[in-house]
A protein has these predicted regions:
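Structural signature for solvent-exposed beta-strand/loop edge elements and short helix-capping sites
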Residues: 1, 7-62, 153
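Short connector loops/turns at beta-strand edges and beta->alpha or beta->beta junctions
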Residues: 5, 18-21, 111, 171-173, ...
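Short, cysteine-centered beta-strand-loop-beta hairpins and adjacent loop/turn segments enriched
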Residues: 9, 84-88, 282
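Acidic, glycine-rich loop-and-beta core segments that form the ion-binding/anion-interacting portion
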Residues: 15, 26, 42, 48, ...
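A generic structural motif
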Residues: 34, 139, 193, 279-283
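Short, contiguous acidic/charged loop-to-helix segments that flank catalytic cores in large enzymes
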Residues: 34-37, 90-94, 294-298
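Gram-negative/organellar outer-membrane beta-barrel architecture
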Residues: 39-264, 269-270
Length: 299
């Protein structure tokens, strides 16, 4: 005979196997809590959130029960985890059009900025808070150079799943020399670049993301404001050659993702809606820019 008893209550939530990731970073992603009624759906959802963090092997996340007390109607929920290396090092190089192209990039996906001055936490860098820190540089010498830096905090303030993203970007590009374009250009690579033709690009973006519970709790919303500034000097490849051009934009991204595994998806769906807008500058300044010169219209 099978006799149905009272619904079980969760006694403890136990986490095992986290060697680098701090325990509070893991617990804040869970949907099961001590004292709540047992829910298989919440345990599956918790395992899915842990898999999507990217710090653990999704195929080895094993939620299980322990210390089951039938008389008291309680049980412990145990999440056994296996940490995996998710940081990235990018090194690339090539040769083409008479130039060497090289790039280097570093991405740390489990960074801890609060421990940056705590030397005991370096393994080899401060880790465990689930933050993402990225650096990248690319150059081919005199013609083109770029640098970018980005940082993402998935839980701003540590209490709610509101993310903060900040990125910076800079690039420097020169134009092609007129000597390079003549019929002897194959032997004139030393005169390929013209430092008198120059474009500098500066970029900054700040974004805030949050999880939303309507129409269901699979949705996220991300809002970003970005600014780019272009400084041109004798630049023949744009609508004007000298001056500055600025671009301010606001973007909103609404995403629904219910996939069970980011790498080997077996179930779920994902879709994204995005919208990017620029402010109506003519309304703010009460000017009709269609009659202005390009240097004024696009500055």
């Amino acid at each position: 005979r099978v006799v149905e008893g009272p619904q079980a209550t969760i006694n403890k939530v136990i986490i095992k196997g986290n060697n680098r990731t701090h325990e509070h970073v893991i617990r804040r992603e869970l949907y099961v809590y001590p004292g709540e009624l047992f829910s298989r759906e919440d345990i599956i959802r918790s395992a899915r959130e842990l898999a999507n963090m990217g710090h653990f092997d999704p195929e080895q996340i094993q939620p299980d029960l322990a210390n089951v007390n039938a008389e008291a109607g309680t049980a412990d929920v145990v999440f056994s985890l296996v940490e995996k290396a998710n940081d990235k090092i990018e090194l690339s190089g090539g040769w083409g059009a008479g130039m060497i192209i090289g790039s280097v990039g570093l991405t740390f996906t489990n960074f801890s900025i609060r421990n940056i001055f705590n030397w005991d936490s370096y393994r080899p860098l401060p880790q465990g808070d689930g933050q993402t820190f990225s650096l990248k540089a690319q150059t081919n010498g005199k013609y083109y150079t770029s640098f970018s830096l980005s940082f993402r905090e998935p839980w701003l303030g540590g209490r709610k799943p509101n993310s903060l993203s900040v990125s910076l970007y800079f690039s420097r590009q020169t134009g092609y020399s007129s000597s390079y374009r003549n019929s002897y250009y194959m032997s004139n690579t030393s005169q390929m670049y013209d430092s008198r033709q120059l474009m500098l690009t500066y970029g900054l973006s700040v974004g805030l993301g949050r999880r939303i519970n309507w129409p269901d709790n699979w949705f996220t919303m991300y809002n970003e404001i970005s600014f780019q500034r272009y400084q041109l000097k004798n630049w023949p490849y744009y609508i004007f050659s000298d001056g500055n051009s600025n671009n301010l934009s606001i973007a909103t991204v609404i995403k629904r993702s219910s996939i069970d595994n980011p790498l080997f998806t077996r179930m779920g769906s994902e879709f994204t809606f995005s919208l990017t807008l620029t402010p109506p500058y003519s309304l703010f300044s009460n000017r009709h820019f269609e009659a202005e010169k390009d240097q004024v219209k696009y500055r």
